[in-house]
Each structure stands twice: as C-alpha cells, then as structure tokens.
Design a protein with these regions (language model features):
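Glycine-rich, phosphate-binding/catalytic loops in enzymes
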Residues: 33-37, 73-74, 126, 160-162
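Pocket-forming structural segment of enzyme catalytic cores
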Residues: 69-153
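Short aromatic-enriched loop/helix-cap "lid" or pocket-rim segments at secondary-structure transitions
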Residues: 11-12, 137, 154-158
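Flexible gly/pro-rich beta->alpha loop and the following alpha-helix that scaffold active-site loops
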Residues: 1-56
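Short amphipathic alpha-helical segments and helix-helix/interface helices
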Residues: 42-46, 98, 194-197
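Active-site metal-binding loops of divalent metal-dependent hydrolases
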Residues: 22-23, 62, 112, 148
Length: 209
C-alpha cells in the first residue's frame, strides 16, 4: 500500500506484514503529513503480532514496530546515508537465520533515527553510527534500520528527491557523496536479504503448520 491507501483490516488474509520506510518519524502528526497515521499503523502492526504473523519493519517501519511493542524510537548517534558495514553481535552470529551475513556485511543506510528497544528485544547487528541496525523483538518479529532492499534504481530515486538533505549533510562522516551512492554495488546485500527471508519463512511454516 502507498499514500492514502487503506491499511489491511483482515489480518487473517495476510501471511506477512512488511512496513517500509519514509521521511517521517513515529512522532510525525497527521497535521504534518496527512497521508501518515502512526497510531493506525501501530494498531495494524499490533493486530499482526497478536495473530502470530510474520512482521518485518524497515527503517521507519522498524521504529513503528518498536513503538508498537513499547520501545520508544530515538535519534541515532550518527546520521547514516550510504553503504557502510553492519557488525553482527554474538546473538546475531549465533542466529542461523543470519548464517550468510558473516561477522560483518556492507548494507544500505538512509536514516537519522533508530528503533527503540523492549526488555525482550535482542540486537542482531549494529554499525559504526548506530547501535540498533537489526533487532529481533520476538519470534518472527524483526526490525531492520538498515536498507538491504536498496538497488541502484531505488537509490537514484532517493537522491533525486533528497538533494537538499544530501547537500546539508555532506560534511557528516557517515554520509557518502551522490557519486558514491550511485555507483555502489547493492547485489550482495540483496542476495543475503533473500536468504534471510527464505530461511525465516521456511522456519515460520515449519512451526505454524
């Protein structure tokens, strides 16, 4: 779904809920962005979690998952725009779903906030600028602050829409220049994301059928 489209009401009709990113934050109001309703999105996420569905949040989506479960989003120590390594924690290294990630993996980033943590949350990966890059909130509920779904085409669109932001952030240590963003190879992280999703859905089917 996209701007102004209705959130799914029949959770039983879906198997997986993926909540993507955007320029907003969980604190953005409807007055500031009429097409975005954080409370309604969190309610939808809560229904999916209660129904034991697969739930994955990406960037803003990860922050909304955290908010739904009681973990308040925060500003990241560093703004990150570009392709930088994430480093798996011991929990991440021991999680078979991330077996192809190795100790570290270069992935996409475009954020200045990060998801909140709950008492049950486990940090799977962190980066040089953000201590909460991948979070397992509970079985089959994950938050990815990073963007492993980036492709050159996606990044080109983001660059075209974010010239002012990129110019204002150019001096920051975890913000790469446009030329670098557009010439990065995003295929390895894409393949690792596919492997994670395949492994996750296989395990979900094994435990729910």
């Amino acid at each position: 779904m996209y701007a102004y489209e209705q959130l799914p009401e029949d959770i039983d009709a879906i198997d997986m809920l993926v909540i993507m990113g955007g320029p907003q934050s969980p604190a953005t109001t409807k007055e500031e962005c009429p097409s975005f309703d954080a409370a309604a999105e969190c309610a939808c996420i809560a229904r999916a979690i209660k129904a034991k569905k697969l739930v994955i949040g990406v960037c803003l989506g990860a922050q909304l998952v955290g908010e739904t479960l009681g973990g308040r989003f925060e500003h990241s120590p560093e703004k990150e725009i570009g392709k930088f390594p994430i480093f798996l924690t011991e929990a991440g290294k021991n999680d078979p779903l991330f077996s192809l990630f190795g100790d570290s993996l270069d992935v996409g980033h475009w954020h200045s906030d990060m998801p909140g943590l709950t008492d049950a949350a486990i940090v799977i990966a962190k980066s040089g600028g953000c201590p909460r890059q991948i979070i397992r909130y509970q079985d089959f509920v994950y938050g990815f602050q990073c963007h492993m779904e980036f492709t050159t085409e996606v990044v080109r669109g983001l660059v075209q829409a974010s010239r002012d932001e990129l110019s204002a952030s150019a001096s920051l240590r975890f913000v790469q220049p446009v030329e670098t963003l557009l010439t990065q190879d995003y295929q390895e992280m894409n393949q690792k994301l596919y492997h994670f999703l395949d492994a996750l859905t296989t395990e979900y089917q094994r435990r729910t059928t």
